[in-house]
Amino acid sequence: MDLKTAVFNAARDGKLRLLTKLLASKSKAEVSSLISEKTNGATPLLMAARYGHLDMVEFLLEQCSASIEVGGSVNFDGETIEGAPPLWAASAAGHLKVVQSLLNHGASVNNTTLTNSTPLRAACFDGHLEIVKYLVEHKADLEVSNRHGHTCLMISCYKGHKEIAQYLLEKGADVNRKSVKGNTALHDCAESGSLDIMKMLLMYCAKMEKDGYGMTPLLSASVTGHTNIVDFLTHHAQTSKTERINALELLGATFVDKKRDLLGALKYWKKAMNMRYSDRTNIISKPVPQTLIMAYDYAKEVNSAEELEGLIADPDEMRMQALLIRERILGPSHPDTSYYIRYRGAVYADSGNFKRCINLWKYALDMQQSNLDPLSPMTASSLLSFAELFSFMLQDRAKGLLGTTVTFDDLMGILCKSVLEIERAIKQTQCPADPLQLNKALSIILHLICLLEKVPCTVEQDHFKKQTIYRFLKLHPRGKNNFSPLHLAVDKNTTCVGRYPVCKFPSLQVTAILIECGADVNVRDSDDNSPLHIAALNNHPDIMNLLIKSGAHFDATNLHKQTASDLLDEKEIAKNLIQPINHTTLQCLAARVIVNHRIYYKGNIPEKLETFVSLHR
């Protein structure tokens, strides 16, 4: 174990005597260097503060001049917090004496993590009331929110820490402050079921506001299934009759899909139906749908007590009612609407009803693409689920275990929607696509193409497939490390796209169809590797031969001046199958001489040859 690690471990474990020995013979500069260095992203002081070693903290500050504000990585409940200062770590862990010492030594009370979380927020999160009080007494700002706009009061409400919430309110915390998504502290109480805190907030004049999705605290409670909050708010003076009805109907939908309690759902739906008809002079009927939805098996919402009673004998119809109600009340843009449609589809798939699953998932995907930003993780998850489902169906079909077939139209429809997602992302120039999300979407598309190659099709269908792939390639999309689709097709890492296996990469079939549809075989990634370089790294001679036959330049070099041949594993059979001499021309040898001898050629030879020579740099 090196000295740096030994110093770090001693500080983390609170072994002051050992640390003193380790540093005894070191110069001031050496001590400073050892104490300031990070191990696993954290300084010795940060670890000492995290684990509450007061004597160690004071020794590091007073004897070693450790920097009191330098942040680092700390782990809480399995989550790594980046950029956490020592005061934040001590506050989160509940070490009051360490917090007091750090502040006495000049620590900034409002110094934040990378996500803009303050020490006060950290103490509020885990319910450390005495630390909260001490920080506030030392001028901690109650209103500093994290990157999501979530305040100390909000997190106290969400975590159910009533005494802390009360203390913050007494100290003047803004009870109606909104997060980035428009949530208030009342929403946090509703989502966590903290009824007592909600009552207290209302005493401090909290307002029933809607969030960014148009959700009131009452609807938030209905979505999360907190009946105590729903019962309380449906009797609140600020709640209208229509809001009460919607809340009860939505709560019933939650009982169906989240709690899996059909009788409980009926109880709340009956309450809502009785409210609709309670005033015979002013019956509140459900809106008449303009069209019936095929994915919901053309179900209609029940509109009378008699129709509601009829649902008892048809559990499947009840589940469709839940989806209809949720879409009507929350709208298509709310994440829960598409989430539970997908959930219901997955349940159908588990029971072998793949047709119902595909119809529901397609409907959810259309909803997501119409309402979410391009390459949203939720949309990517839907596309991946389709790829995994189709792969499973094709495997079981091949084994003769499954009667249902995967049709070309099903697969092609999802490929088209996947390409549409890339088009949407590339058109959004003001906000460039996240490379990791784009890489995932590109990988999913390649898996879908791979699956399509296993499905029989007509000449017209084959033409449409290649036309779509051509359109996809013309978008010139790039993934991680600036990989083109062809780079991804020849890389083994493309195999790992989700939890379940879909297709195996490198894929000769996918590579072949990409080339046939116009993929550039000499395209470069950020390390100047061509697809041939990546195929060589993956030791796939068949793909290398295909790329070379299709015009890939064999002795082109990458950023590290390596050819594809240099990257082949000598132990692999590929070395024997790819003979450099068979693919090296006199023109290549001349270009190498020019590059190796640094002969100035720009402007002295035709532009086309300049490009050729540059391939050999």
Curated annotation (Swiss-Prot):
Record GO cellular component, one term: nucleoplasm
Pfam families, A to Z: Ank, Ank_2
Keywords assigned by UniProt, alphabetized: Acetylation, ANK repeat, Repeat, TPR repeat, Ubl conjugation pathway
Family matches, as InterPro entries: Ankyrin_rpt, Ankyrin_rpt-contain_sf, TPR-like_helical_dom_sf
SUPFAM superfamilies: Ankyrin repeat
The keyword Acetylation appears for this protein: yes
GO biological process, one term: ubiquitin-dependent protein catabolic process via the C-end degron rule pathway
One annotated GO molecular function: ubiquitin-like ligase-substrate adaptor activity
Cross-referenced SMART domains: ANK
Domain commentary: The first seven ANK repeats at the N-terminus (1-242) are essnetial for recognition of Lys/Arg-Xaa-Arg and -Lys/Arg-Xaa-Xaa-Arg C-degrons.
Function of the molecule: Substrate-recognition component of a Cul2-RING (CRL2) E3 ubiquitin-protein ligase complex of the DesCEND (destruction via C-end degrons) pathway, which recognizes a C-degron located at the extreme C terminus of target proteins, leading to their ubiquitination and degradation. The C-degron recognized by the DesCEND pathway is usually a motif of less than ten residues and can be present in full-length proteins, truncated proteins or proteolytically cleaved forms.
Subunit composition and interactions: Component of a Cul2-RING (CRL2) E3 ubiquitin-protein ligase complex, also named ECS (Elongin BC-CUL2/5-SOCS-box protein) complex, composed of CUL2, Elongin BC (ELOB and ELOC), RBX1 and substrate-specific adapter FEM1C.
Family membership: Belongs to the fem-1 family.
Name of the protein described by the UniProt record: Protein fem-1 homolog C
